[in-house]
């Protein structure tokens, strides 16, 4: 990240993986907040892969640092439906979802949970039906 200057526009990272994105995330939440603050940024999103394990810790750390927390998730979207589990056909596509409000947060929790309970195929997967059902309050 570059240091802010007087001529820079406000900037917020909207695609960050924390230590809760297993095998992918290298950011420790507390250290991340320190760096975001050092760079003069006022907001940041947490979009771990398929999980929301770190959202509460992320939210509390951001608030404590005076940074606006944006809760989200990089969900895995099944090619056909979350129930289909055929190798080479039902791969995963990635989609970043961000919560606009409390309704979006609740809907994202429901969607991610359904991905684990109903759509798990090496990774928790959602599908178009879940996106249609739980889209309210999400970007």
Across the structure, where does each feature detected by a protein language model lie?
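Phosphodiester-processing cores and adjacent nucleic acid-binding clamps
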Residues: 1-139
């Amino acid at each position: 990240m570059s240091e802010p200057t007087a001529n820079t526009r406000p900037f917020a990272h909207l695609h960050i993986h924390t230590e809760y994105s297993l095998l992918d995330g290298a950011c420790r939440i507390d250290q991340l907040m320190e760096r975001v603050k050092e760079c003069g940024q006022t907001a940041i999103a947490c979009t771990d892969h398929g999980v929301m394990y770190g959202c509460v810790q992320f939210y509390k750390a951001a608030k404590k640092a005076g940074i606006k927390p944006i809760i989200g998730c990089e969900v895995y979207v099944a090619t056909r439906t979350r129930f289909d589990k055929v190798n080479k056909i039902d791969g995963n596509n990635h989609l970043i979802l961000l919560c606009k409000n409390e309704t979006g947060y609740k809907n994202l929790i429901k969607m991610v949970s359904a991905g684990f309970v109903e759509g798990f195929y090496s990774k928790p997967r959602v599908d178009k039906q879940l996106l249609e059902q739980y889209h309210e309050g999400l970007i």
